[in-house]
Design a protein with these regions (language model features):
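Non-catalytic helical/linker scaffolds that mediate oligomerization, partner binding
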Residues: 1-480
């Protein structure tokens, strides 16, 4: 594995063709994101089937992340686009209307989430078109909210709206989201990204839907609201992973605060052994150009050095002019950055449980032995995640008896979820099967040294309590 930091790429019109998806995998994609803010179930199923077929042909494990759109707040339909000027009046009507100009320097619109208008107060701000236009609330009555525009900008139909100063209380999971979740369950996606999470309750609601359908899927909370930043500790505890979604976050909080918030969230996720994705506008210029800016390359590099498990491409791969090139640039940036990576963080974290002590010891011992790889025999994937937390400068190869578990590790830093073995209650048989499969697939050489972690009794989550050093003699024994 050339790189340890993983790449998530969004599938869209620019990347949906089989030959492009194939090249993106070859260039370094580990996880594909299906963005349910756009497209039909049939569209996403077609892309999902293509990804899985191509990954199988390439003998590569690729994870699937379903990004649930959530209650995105948008402008209603406009009769025609507005060219708003500083000082113009813009009224937000409580009823559904067709947005239009009603007088000189005076416009009216409606929004799709009307209950939010009841939560606004005088002097609060509304940001339109994903933050490009700012409006200040100056008057509120039973019919409308009156605002004054504070900067010039164009406004179109169905554009995003943010309320950074307003405490908003709306359901994070809409009926559309519930239908999309059922699609994800049916099609066995590996990760769910939940939009506009504000607290742990929002994660618990999704987990309850999964439980009602007798399934488990790793839930990633998208941090893009100010409330989420305030409640980050409880969100990390409740979720399986975190996505730092810097687009909306940079509207909800002053954008110059985003870098420090990103670093803090990554550190907290690392502390909790929860995978974290850094997302949005990482190589944004590649949506329209073949080359990235130096600042964008530095942005990717800094996210890697911060300790992110994965970096994500959005528009760059969904609608960009050359998605495979975007993946290649990101991959090369990661590889170069990891030459100066602060590996071996054995003393950076507190032990959360006894498994942490075992995994820290195994990562440390493997480094001291100059082992060629760590093999993690795992039922749930947690032991491999915990080893990765310490960032050893050697490959972590996950061995499991569940495709679902191995797929869930496709997003975790430094973990190669490569070896699928049969489930066994006999530890010796499990070790033999693991060593044989690893040698046959070319991940283990009989003349090298490895470290292996496992749990006894076998097949039980949370029982990692065993470390084995595998040298030539031990490998030969298990190959008998």
């Amino acid at each position: 594995m050339l790189k340890k930091t993983k790449i998530v790429a969004t599938v869209g019109p620019a990347s949906e063709k089989e030959e492009i998806l194939r090249q993106m995998i070859i260039n370094g994609v580990n996880v594909f994101r299906l963005n349910f803010s756009h497209g039909t179930h049939e569209y996403h199923k077609k892309n999902l089937d293509t990804i899985r077929r191509v990954a199988k042909e390439l003998h590569t494990r690729i994870g699937i992340l379903q990004d649930i759109s959530g209650p995105k707040i948008r402008t209603g339909e406009l009769k025609e686009p507005f060219e708003l000027k500083k000082g113009d009046r813009l009224d937000f009507y409580r009823e559904t209307i067709l947005g239009e100009k009603i007088a000189q320097n005076h416009y009216k619109i409606s929004i799709n989430q009307k209950s939010i208008l009841d939560m606004l107060k005088i002097d609060e701000y509304i940001y339109l078109y994903d933050g490009s236009i700012r409006a200040k609330v100056v008057s509120i009555d039973d019919q409308k909210i009156e605002t004054i525009i504070e900067n010039d900008g164009f406004l179109n139909s169905n554009k995003g709206i943010n309320f950074p100063n307003t405490k908003i209380n709306i359901d994070v999971i809409t009926q559309k989201d519930k239908n999309d979740l059922l699609w994800g369950i049916k099609n066995e996606v590996d990760f769910l990204a939940i939009s506009f999470v504000q607290n742990a309750h929002d994660i618990d609601e999704v987990r309850e839907i999964l439980a009602q359908n007798n399934t488990k899927i790793s839930i990633f909370a998208k941090i893009e609201k100010f409330d989420a930043v305030e409640n980050i500790d409880e969100i990390i505890k409740s979720s399986d992973g975190i996505m730092v979604a810097r687009g909306d976050l940079g509207i909800e909080v002053p954008y110059y605060k985003v870098p420090n918030i990103q670093k803090e969230i990554i550190q907290k996720a690392n502390n909790a052994s929860k995978p974290v994705i850094t997302a949005t506008q990482m190589l944004f210029s590649l949506a329209k150009s073949k080359t990235a800016t130096r600042a964008e390359i530095s942005d990717v590099a800094n996210a890697v050095l911060d300790g992110t498990d994965a970096v994500m491409l959005s528009e760059e791969s969904a609608v960009g002019i050359d998605p495979a090139n975007a993946v290649d640039i990101m991959c090369q940036t990661i590889i170069e950055t990891e030459k100066r990576y602060p590996y071996n963080k054995f003393n950076d974290f507190n032990d959360l449980d006894n498994t942490d002590k075992i995994m820290r010891s195994s990562a440390h011992l493997a480094t001291d032995l100059n082992a060629d790889a760590i093999f993690s025999l795992t039922s749930s994937g947690k032991s491999a995640i915990k080893i990765a937390r310490y960032r050893p400068n050697i490959e972590i190869i996950a061995v499991g008896h569940s495709e679902k578990t191995l797929n869930s590790l496709s997003i975790v830093w430094g973990v190669n979820p490569a070896i699928l073995v049969n489930k066994s209650n006999e530890l010796t048989e499990l070790l033999k099967d693991s060593v044989r499969s690893s040698v046959e697939k070319g991940f283990m050489d009989e003349d090298k040294c490895y470290l292996l972690t496992a749990g006894f009794p076998t097949g039980v989550e949370g029982t990692s309590n065993l470390i084995r050093i595998l040298n030539k003699e031990q490998i030969a024994y298990y190959l008998q």
